[in-house]
């Protein structure tokens, strides 16, 4: 079987790729199916993967010719992770629409044309919610995105659900909490600070938190996110029924709570490297996101959250070689 990861050069795509190569199979319909080829599609080539099963396709995801290079009749599973992040999609409307919406539709059409109904997993976001939200968002809480990124993700959810209803693909959507702690450098996402205020101080660098200390965030670690992606693709479509979207479990933590966890794990000197200068551009986006949602359905489907944000920090330190 060919497995495709769009956004395969990104940090989550690379972590997923490494896990799939290590496993060597996906359990589909109760049977292990060998991953004979792992195709990574992105605008740049991924680094650090030396495996004969890996095939790299670089190009514009919205180009049908590029998609036809990546998706063929042997493609049994597609992880669609590629996206223009929230802050960038807000700053460049046309780019966000082309990558987050047009490319998603083009991917679905390519799968439809092949006619073999592959499993297709889309990642969505807390950004599909907004406005006046209940303290805990439910699975049936109305979508009301307050950013272009959130709108694009919401439309993608509906498209994948309808392509599944029509039998074109076997789709599933995972609404990811904000992923923290991401490795690497800051990006243009409005939520980038949720990793930076932990990652940079641990590296000896000062970091600013652009939101108020009491701002709540719904968080998930990279390890838990990758495990969720695998569980999501392996779920039988019958278990999802006509509700193809799943709100993943997470941790509800305030910005101040994150720094207190950092203080407990790494000490005062590290935590004191965080400054607090609010930025309206970031707050106007992040402030519309839910602080927590009811994940009972996700838990029943086998998805798991992190035990605590202290453990999230420790896991990041271990992965980054910073553990004491």
Curated annotation (Swiss-Prot):
The lineage of its organism: Bacteria, Pseudomonadati, Pseudomonadota, Betaproteobacteria, Burkholderiales. Disruption phenotype: Deletion mutant is unable to use D-erythronate as a carbon source. This is D-erythronate dehydrogenase. The keyword NADP applies. The keyword 4Fe-4S does not apply. NAD(+) binds at residues 125, 149, 153. The active site is at 149 (proton acceptor). It catalyses: D-erythronate + NAD(+) = 2-dehydro-D-erythronate + NADH + H(+). It holds the Pfam family Epimerase. It is an enzyme of class 1 (oxidoreductase). One of its GO terms (molecular function) is oxidoreductase activity.
């Amino acid at each position: 079987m060919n497995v495709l990861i769009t956004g395969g050069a990104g940090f989550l795509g690379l972590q997923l790729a490494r896990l799939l190569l290590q496993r060597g199979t996906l359990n589909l319909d109760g049977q292990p199916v060998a991953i004979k080829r792992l195709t990574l599609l992105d605008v740049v080539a991924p680094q650090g993967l030396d495996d004969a099963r890996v095939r790299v396709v670089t190009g514009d995801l919205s180009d049908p010719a590029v998609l036809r290079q990546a998706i063929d009749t042997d493609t049994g599973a597609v992880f669609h992770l590629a996206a223009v992040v929230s802050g960038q999609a807000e700053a460049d409307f046309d780019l966000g629409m082309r990558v987050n919406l047009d490319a998603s539709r083009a991917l679905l059409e390519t799968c439809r044309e092949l006619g073999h109904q592959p499993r297709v997993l889309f990642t969505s976001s807390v950004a599909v919610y907004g406005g006046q939200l209940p303290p805990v968002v439910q699975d049936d809480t109305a979508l009301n995105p307050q950013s272009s990124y959130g709108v694009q993700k919401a439309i993608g959810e509906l498209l994948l659900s309808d392509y599944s209803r029509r039998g074109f693909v076997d789709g599933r959507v995972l609404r990811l909490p904000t992923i923290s702690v991401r490795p690497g450098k800051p990006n243009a996402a409005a939520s980038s600070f949720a990793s930076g205020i932990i990652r940079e101080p641990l590296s000896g660098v000062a970091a600013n938190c652009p939101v108020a200390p009491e701002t709540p965030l719904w968080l998930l670690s990279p390890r838990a996110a990758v495990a969720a992606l695998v569980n999501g693709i392996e779920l039988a479509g019958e278990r999802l029924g006509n509700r193809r979207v799943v709100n993943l479990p997470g941790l509800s933590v305030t910005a101040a709570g994150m720094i207190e966890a950092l203080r407990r794990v790494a000490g005062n000197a590290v935590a004191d490297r965080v400054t607090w200068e609010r930025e309206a551009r970031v707050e106007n986006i992040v402030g519309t996101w839910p602080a927590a949602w009811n994940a009972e359905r996700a838990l029943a489907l086998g998805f798991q959250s992190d035990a605590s944000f202290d453990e999230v920090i420790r896991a990041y330190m271990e992965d980054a070689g910073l553990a004491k």
